[in-house]
Amino acid sequence: MKNVTDPFLSLSYWPSAGSFGFNTDILATNPINLSVVLGVLIFFGKGVLSDLLDNRKQRILKTIRNSEELREGALEQLEKARSRLRKVEKEADQFRVNGYSEIEREKLNLINSTSKTLEQLENYKNETIHFEQQRAINEVRQRVFQQALEGALGTLNSCLNNELHLRTISTNIGMFGTMKEITD
């Protein structure tokens, strides 16, 4: 335990924010700590993230398939509408003298309603895909953040005793205060 805590005892020997100095304590340098944390996150989070993304992909693909089926149904309805349109056009030729304007209005209404239905189905498909993508992204972000936080807290709690933990927190609070003053 002494070998693990020796580098943390040197925290009190850090140069102040206004002076220049080199920190030779390898465990207290930011790039190494960050690379260790990132390595742990990548190692433990890769499998979970891969599973989450695969599940999300399957859900999105299922939604796309459902939307495609709805689209095919709409295309079938459109084809039926076109065949009815052809039938109406034939009847229009026969009854042109008696009711040409009425048949023309019916034809336009039929085309408009079919186009609106197809457009609504396409919009529904696009909204569903967008919603599922956003939900998947948000879920992945939440889980990665939670795992990163748990991993970091677990690492810190396993390496620090109470006194060192309090000193580290005080030092970090001081550094954040200094950084905030600099940025303000």
Curated annotation (Swiss-Prot):
Species lineage: Eukaryota, Viridiplantae, Streptophyta, Embryophyta, Tracheophyta
Cellular compartment(s): Plastid, Chloroplast thylakoid membrane
Family recorded in the similarity comment: Belongs to the ATPase B chain family.
Species the sequence originates in: Morus indica (Mulberry)
Gene this protein is translated from: atpF
Quaternary data: F-type ATPases have 2 components, F(1) - the catalytic core - and F(0) - the membrane proton channel. F(1) has five subunits: alpha(3), beta(3), gamma(1), delta(1), epsilon(1). F(0) has four main subunits: a(1), b(1), b'(1) and c(10-14). The alpha and beta chains form an alternating ring which encloses part of the gamma chain. F(1) is attached to F(0) by a central stalk formed by the gamma and epsilon chains, while a peripheral stalk is formed by the delta, b and b' chains.
Keywords, sorted A to Z: ATP synthesis, CF(0), Chloroplast, Hydrogen ion transport, Ion transport, Membrane, Plastid, Thylakoid, Transmembrane, Transmembrane helix, Transport
Function: F(1)F(0) ATP synthase produces ATP from ADP in the presence of a proton or sodium gradient. F-type ATPases consist of two structural domains, F(1) containing the extramembraneous catalytic core and F(0) containing the membrane proton channel, linked together by a central stalk and a peripheral stalk. During catalysis, ATP synthesis in the catalytic domain of F(1) is coupled via a rotary mechanism of the central stalk subunits to proton translocation. Component of the F(0) channel, it forms part of the peripheral stalk, linking F(1) to F(0).
Listed name of the protein: ATP synthase subunit b, chloroplastic
Origin: domain of life: Eukaryota
Gene Ontology CC: one annotated term: proton-transporting ATP synthase complex
Note: In plastids the F-type ATPase is also known as CF(1)CF(0).
